[in-house]
Swiss-Prot record:
Its EC number is 2.7.4.9. It comes from Rhizorhabdus wittichii (strain DSM 6014 / CCUG 31198 / JCM 15750 / NBRC 105917 / EY 4224 / RW1) (Sphingomonas wittichii). One of its GO terms (biological process) is dTDP biosynthetic process. CDD domains: TMPK. Phosphorylation of dTMP to form dTDP in both de novo and salvage pathways of dTTP synthesis. PANTHER family: THYMIDYLATE KINASE (PTHR10344), UMP-CMP KINASE 2, MITOCHONDRIAL (PTHR10344:SF4). This is Thymidylate kinase. GO terms for molecular function: ATP binding; dTMP kinase activity. HAMAP family: Thymidylate_kinase. It holds the Pfam family Thymidylate_kin.
């Protein structure tokens, strides 16, 4: 049975981390061998870069520096964690991947898609997921969810202003419209169980 690479994407507060864990558990319940990972991070080198990217003031890095750091972390992550797992026939569920760089640095911060994809081609040979699940909900509702959970403004990106997060959401929707074969947009509102069921449904054609 071939391994599969599944990514979860979306803006701040849409529930990616919660749903990545729930999706991995649901896939294991179906008898699949699943690796859970995240970006930035997922390998020793990438986790070190994660700390550089997420800690500190919102303006610690400019968009170009961020894009380079993300690409470096991703290159190590793909080489050391993702590709070996896929080649061993395992399923990989990853909280964020390339599309986040396109939406955040490429779209919201104005570097453009081409620059981000060029870095990805250099660092990770253009490696792409088998399926990307984009969790989508209004930015205001996502921010309210974070505030209720007491996790608002916990890293550099969450500290950015509302206009930035609106641009991120718009960029994700644009990317999804451009790549409908790979990306499925999932309504992130409702109970966690309802959202997980939508994720599983969006993977139906890949499941054994």
């Amino acid at each position: 049975m071939p391994g599969r690479f599944i990514t979860l994407e979306g803006g701040e507060g849409v529930g990616k981390s919660t749903q990545a864990k729930a999706l991995a558990a649901a896939l294991r319940a179906r008898g699949l061998d699943v690796v859970e990972t995240r970006e930035p991070g997922g390998s020793d080198g990438a986790e070190a870069i994660r700390r550089l990217l997420l800690e500190g003031a919102a303006d610690r890095w400019n968009a170009r520096a961020e894009a380079l750091l993300f690409a470096a972390a991703r290159a190590d992550h793909v080489a050391r964690t993702i590709r070996p797992a896929i080649e061993a026939g395992r399923w990989v569920v990853c909280d964020r991947f390339l599309d986040s760089s396109i939406a955040y640095q490429g779209g919201a911060d104005g570097l453009g898609d081409e620059a981000i994809r060029t870095l990805h081609a250099i660092g990770s040979a253009g490696y792409l997921p088998d399926r990307t699940l984009l969790l989508d909900m209004p930015v205001f509702d996502a921010a309210f969810r974070q505030a209720e959970a007491g996790i608002a403004n916990s890293d550099r990106f969450e500290k950015r202003d509302e206009a930035f997060h609106d641009r991120v959401a718009d960029s994700f929707r644009r990317i999804a419209a451009q790549e409908p074969a790979r990306i499925r947009t999932i309504n992130a509102q409702g109970s966690p169980q309802e959202v997980t069921a939508r994720l599983i449904e969006a993977l139906a054609d890949l499941l054994p």
